[in-house]
Amino acid sequence: KNFALAILVVTFVVAVFGNTNLDPPTRPTRLRREAKPEAEPGNNRPVYIPQPRPPHPRLRREAEPEAEPGNNRPVYIPQPRPPHPRLRREAELEAEPGNNRPVYISQPRPPHPRLRREAEPEAEPGNNRPVYIPQPRPPHPRLRREAELEAEPGNNRPVYISQPRPPHPRLRREAEPEAEPGNNRPVYIPQPRPPHPRLRREAEPEAEPGNNRPVYIPQPRPPHPRLRREAEPEAEPGNNRPVYIPQPRPPHPRLRREAKPEAKPGNNRPVYIPQPRPPHPRI
């Protein structure tokens, strides 16, 4: 029994402490095998040849008639289509047959009504720009053009004689009795009107009859109370400034004027004798 126990102890010691290599364990090496392009018939990866498909319809590729038979890009010849109506391309009658751009001759159309082009009677027959002679139309009412009676027949600007109209009421033009008959500016004699009340104009009795500024004699009015004007008894009758004699008023209490007993009777400044007052207590 002791002998069996000793065998077990020796076996355990040898199993635990028997590794005498002090170096750390290394990673096992992996074998790197090269690819085998010549796969044996037992390889289960099939050889796949995709079916050719046409390219996208919006991709316009040129035909490749010399493509080798082993090329899987198909030979695609797109159908010709007319260009956009807004693209006015000149016809290419000498285009080579191998060119896949179609020969397109667009129908002529008249230009925009706002585009006034001169007629081109000498245009060559191969030019697809039509010869367009626009219909004459009267100009805008606000455009006062002079009539062109001597305009040549080939000029497409119409001869327009506008109707005369009176000018704006705020535009005071002088009458033109000597205007020539071919002038389309009417002879306008405005009605006289009185000037603004705040405009004090002197009367013009000698104004000529042809002057359209009326002779206006304003009514006299008294001046402002704060305007102390001296009386003008010798004013001429034609002067429209009225003769105004203001009423005398006492001066300001703080204004100590000395009395002037020798003042002339024609002076309209009153003779004022202030009442005496006692002096200041601090003086």
Swiss-Prot record:
InterPro entries: Apidaecin
Signal sequence bounds: 1-18
Record-annotated disulphide pairs: none
Biological-process GO terms, alphabetical: defense response to bacterium; innate immune response
Ranges that cross the membrane: none
Maturation propeptide residues: 19-41, 62-69, 90-97, 118-125, 146-153, 174-181, 202-209, 230-237, 258-265
Domain of life: Eukaryota
Keywords, comma-separated and alphabetical: Antibiotic, Antimicrobial, Cleavage on pair of basic residues, Immunity, Innate immunity, Repeat, Secreted, Signal
Pfam families: Apidaecin
Record's subcellular location: Secreted
Gene Ontology cellular-component terms listed: extracellular region
Ranges of Pro residues composition bias in the record: 273-283
Region annotation Disordered: where it falls in the sequence: 19-283
Keyword Protein transport among UniProt keywords: no
UniProt function note: Apidaecins have bactericidal activity; predominantly against Gram-negative bacteria. They seem to interfere with cell propagation.
Protein family according to the UniProt entry: Belongs to the apidaecin family.
Protein name: Apidaecins type 73
Gene that this sequence comes from: APID73
